Amino acid sequence: MLDLAIAGHLFTAVLIGLAVGIEREWSGHTHGPDGRFGGARTFALLGLVGGFAGWFLRLDHALTAAVLIGGATLFVVAAYRAAMQRPDTTPDSTTEVVAIVVVAMGVTAGLGFRTMASATAALV
């Protein structure tokens, strides 16, 4: 059952993703000719997926967590490949690397290490 502590961990994971996504939008990474895939909603969902993966790891459901993390990573890789297919795109993978870091911070928050995840988000 989802208790208040787990909900707080998941909420932290979503807030981390949301903060990173808002920063990416504000700095112009999602707009223009070289716009990337991730905005506030995308990064919030990636943080939530990571949070759920961390929660499943706490419940000893490592396979479910691995599927969630692998699926999020495949999504990021597919977005990068799609961006590189555009003829006017310069090679840059900053947004994609940050997306994978957001998933990792979500996992950290989902495991219960909210302070560590939040401090890492402040550095990103």
Regions picked out by a protein language model, each given a short descriptive name:
Residues 18-32, 72-91, 124:
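C-terminal ends of transmembrane helices
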Residues 11, 15-19, 44-48, 52, ...:
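Hydrophobic, lipid-facing residues on alpha-helical transmembrane segments of integral membrane proteins
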Residues 32-45, 64-70, 86-101, 118-121:
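Cytoplasmic-side transmembrane-helix entry/capping segments in multi-pass membrane proteins
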Residues 20-28, 94-97, 108-124:
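Membrane-interface module
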